[in-house]
């Protein structure tokens, strides 16, 4: 997997993890995000980290549908410019269009796009080539965030006429029905989509600010998401190595005593050569990082 994400997305998850009683520093480290990425100047982290955060969050809190909880305890500005592009838009529909147009300022690994905008409906799709639970939770979070934000801005309970998810149907989808306000939710679909009818699409935002919206759009047009620094890949590698058992427990298992550079590169969605180059840029090597992981495992 290639690409990068804004640290704002990681902080978004970690804020909710902290509220749930988890240690955000430890959770970030387990996902491959070092303190420098979160506390330093604006930058980016490897695209794997955000999805790993969601997976770890769900696993440790042991509650289903944590992506839907993205709307809980929301603080204005958590997602930076994106928050204000959505809130200052003239209508709900314009907010969705702004989120789709400028979403690449937050992530290059996933995209939100308007796939239908007709006389009667507006449909957005959260697209990614990535499979797995992290991607499923990220899709939940994207739709939960947008729905909650436009409800707040419009001062109305915006109810989608249809929502589809690629994920398999959960045993109980009451939480989805309760949050979105509709039973028209399909699981196992070909794409993650959310559809609004004309009435909700054209609802006016009480927080609309045309002048500020224009300034924000001009700024977003020239903004771009940076490439993760070399050190970010060292943090991600350390997290991946630390997730392996010290010794092999079965023929098919991977452990710290058997893992190869090629295998770990595959797990990180890159090539062995690229991983070596990134480690060299950070002033380290595969052998050094593997030795460090074995020392940590030995305790």
Each predicted region: which residue ranges?
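N-terminal low-complexity or simple alpha-helical regulatory segments
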Residues: 1-122
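Extended mid-to-C-terminal alpha-helical interaction segments
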Residues: 170, 178-299
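Short, contiguous, pocket-lining structural segments
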Residues: 19, 134, 138, 229, ...
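Short amphipathic alpha-helical face segments that pack within enzyme cores
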Residues: 12, 141-145, 297
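Residues within well-ordered alpha helices
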Residues: 16, 26-27, 149, 240, ...
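N-terminal regulatory/effector-sensing and dimerization cores
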Residues: 80-200
């Amino acid at each position: 997997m290639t690409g990068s994400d804004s640290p704002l997305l990681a902080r978004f998850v970690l804020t909710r993890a902290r509220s749930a009683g988890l240690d955000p520093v430890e959770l970030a480290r387990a996902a491959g995000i070092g303190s420098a990425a979160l506390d330093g100047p604006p930058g980016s982290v490897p695209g794997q980290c955000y999805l790993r955060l969601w997976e770890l969050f769900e696993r440790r809190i042991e509650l289903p549908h944590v992506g839907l909880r993205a709307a809980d305890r929301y603080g204005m500005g958590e997602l930076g410019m994106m928050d204000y592009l959505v809130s200052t838009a003239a209508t709900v529909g314009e907010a969705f269009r702004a989120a789709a147009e400028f979403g690449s300022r937050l992530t290059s690994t996933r995209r939100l796009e308007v796939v239908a905008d007709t006389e009667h409906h507006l449909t957005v799709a959260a697209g990614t080539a990535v499979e797995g639970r992290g991607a499923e939770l990220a899709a939940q979070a994207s739709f939960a965030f947008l729905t909650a934000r436009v409800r707040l801005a419009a001062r109305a309970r915006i109810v989608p006429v249809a929502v589809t998810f690629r994920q398999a149907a959960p045993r109980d989808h009451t939480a989805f029905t309760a949050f979105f306000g509709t039973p028209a939710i399909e699981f196992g679909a070909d794409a993650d989509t959310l559809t609004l009818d004309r009435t909700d699409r054209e609802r006016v935002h009480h927080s609309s600010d045309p002048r500020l919206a224009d300034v924000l759009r001009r700024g977003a047009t020239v903004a771009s998401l940076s490439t993760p620094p070399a050190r970010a890949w060292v943090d991600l590698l350390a997290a991946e190595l630390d997730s392996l058992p010290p010794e092999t427990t079965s023929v098919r298992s991977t452990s710290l005593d058997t893992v190869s550079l090629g295998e770990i590169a595959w797990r990180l969605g890159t090539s062995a050569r690229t991983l070596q180059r990134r480690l060299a840029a950070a002033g380290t090597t595969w052998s050094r990082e593997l030795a460090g992981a074995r020392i940590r495992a030995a305790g």
